[in-house]
Amino acid sequence: MLHIINRSPQSNNALENCLNTAAGGDILLIEDAVYAATAGNAIEGTLRAAMGRFKISVLRPDLEARGLADRLIEGVSPVDYGGFVDLTANNKTCQSWL
């Protein structure tokens, strides 16, 4: 399953809810959720711990638009829009967390 999250972990608990509820799969962080994939943020440890159960990707254009490309956590895969399409096509179901 592909889990899509678009809210910053500082303003919304969608990512934490996903990590606490879902059994595994792919996570794609888009829009303001890309802040969760940066070194030094409050949820960095939680995200790193989840890497055993989830493959975590971040939408590179959103990361770059926020000037955060150089702060990406090791183990998180940046993807372009084509990669977003591939993740969607490779998963039978997609869940957007609000």
Regions found by a protein language model. Give the residues of each.
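Short, glycine-rich nucleotide/cofactor-binding loops
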Residues: 1-14, 31-39
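Structural motif
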Residues: 2, 26, 93-94
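Structural motif corresponding to alpha-helix initiation and N-cap regions
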Residues: 12, 40-44, 78-81
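Short internal beta-strands
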Residues: 25-31, 54-62
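C-terminal structural segments of small proteins and small subunits
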Residues: 66-98
